[in-house]
Amino acid sequence: AWVYDPEREQRPIVLLAGSAEEASELRDHFVRVGIDNVTGYITSLDGLDLVTPKLVKPEELGTFEHTLLLDVRNKTEFAAGHLPEAVNISGGRVLWALDQLPNNGTIVTYCQSGVRNSIAASVLRSQGYDVVELEGSYLGWVAVSGNTPVTEPDLIEAA
């Protein structure tokens, strides 16, 4: 649900799968959650155009022209520490929060280490936004700025 809204999306889905059997099983999972326009599968990315995302280094962010600095981590991570002037929309909600984003200009995105960010940035690009990813994400910025990184609290056993 991070990258696909079945109510708005009309493009057919092609799955990346190891075999026809695996593709069929994956299609069944999609159908169970209301996504029924899976039309085929591929077994390799060979021959496909791959996008190399634009990046901005943490030390260049202060002089880099952008309209919005978007933190796609969860609310708890954001509350524990974030980049100055950042706006928080969890990566899993970006597709449903497009009305909160500027129509023009460049959006710089980041998460904790870069994984969720790459997904959220890809979603925004698919919707026509100009997106630049913060190299190293939050942890990269922390390393350059000297700020204390946010760490996840240990899980405790429930009684």
Language-model segments: which ranges?
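Rhodanese-like catalytic fold shared by cysteine-dependent sulfurtransferases
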Residues: 1-159
